[in-house]
Design a protein with these regions (language model features):
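Single conserved hydrophobic/aromatic residue that forms the stacking wall/gate
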Residues: 1-16
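Short, conserved charged micro-motifs
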Residues: 123-129, 167-170
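Conserved core segment of the aminotransferase class I/II
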Residues: 18-86, 96-97, 177, 181, ...
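Generic structural signal for small/hydrophobic residues in well-ordered secondary structure
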Residues: 17, 35, 69, 88, ...
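Conserved glycine-rich beta-strand-loop-beta hairpin in the small C-terminal domain of fold type I
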Residues: 70, 87-96, 106-119, 155
Length: 205
């Protein structure tokens, strides 16, 4: 399969595309729910309908969030984003490389901070029961795939590899630093330990 870098649809049809951007992911502000739409004049009818819908759905964002957003949108984030992507790729690749096996179907993360492993050697009545067993036996908390519309009988779980101090990690690397196991053991020990425990659970009978 040939993978090509993602391209934004406005590059092909700017007059028929609206752009939505939010701070929750790239700015690590998950609870803020702040973002914006850029809508071309050709879609003014859509814009007007969305304004009506928005006015009936939520009120204005709190002042502290607005001030923080102004600071965020007026700063240069190149170094931050480069380091964040490097760290998440390093952590995600580590988890992937340690979990992939004949007993686990898993795809490498192409962005973000989630993996969706399928444990094909496990036989539970549903993925929720499987995740309960993982938590009980390893202390690793995963969400069942059924919570995301996947078949309950599929032993799939969503794994988030973000249980580490990102600020501390960033402060101790440069943009060209290679993320290896030594760094992960120092700045993401819970990831290393949790992955080891989960791998042990997979290999257990």
């Amino acid at each position: 399969m040939i993978r090509r870098p993602p391209r934004s649809t406005p590059l092909y049809s700017s007059a028929a595309s609206d752009v939505y951007k939010r701070q929750s992911k790239w700015c690590a502000a998950g609870g803020w729910r702040l973002g914006y739409f850029v809508i071309p004049e050709s879609l003014n009818l859509l814009r007007d309908k969305m304004k009506v819908l928005a006015s009936e759905t939520f009120s204005s964002v709190s002042s502290p969030i607005q001030y923080a957003a102004i600071k965020a949108y007026n700063s240069d984030h190149k170094t931050y984003l480069t380091k964040a992507k490097k760290i998440l790729k390093g952590v995600g690749d580590y988890v992937y490389e340690n979990l992939k096996s004949n007993n686990t179907i898993i795809n490498k993360s192409q962005g973000g901070f989630y993996l969706m492993p399928e444990f094909i050697n496990k036989d539970f009545s549903n993925s929720n029961e499987m995740c309960d067993d993982i938590l009980k036996k390893t202390g690793v908390a995963l969400l069942p795939g059924s919570d995301f519309g996947l078949l309950q009988e599929k032993m799939i779980a969503r794994l988030s590899f973000t249980d580490f101090d990102g600020v501390k990690f960033m402060e101790n690397i440069e943009v060209n630093t290679k993320i290896d196991k030594n760094l992960l053991s120092e700045f993401a020990p819970k990831i290393v330990n949790g992955t080891k425990r989960l791998k042990g659970w997979v290999e257990s009978t």
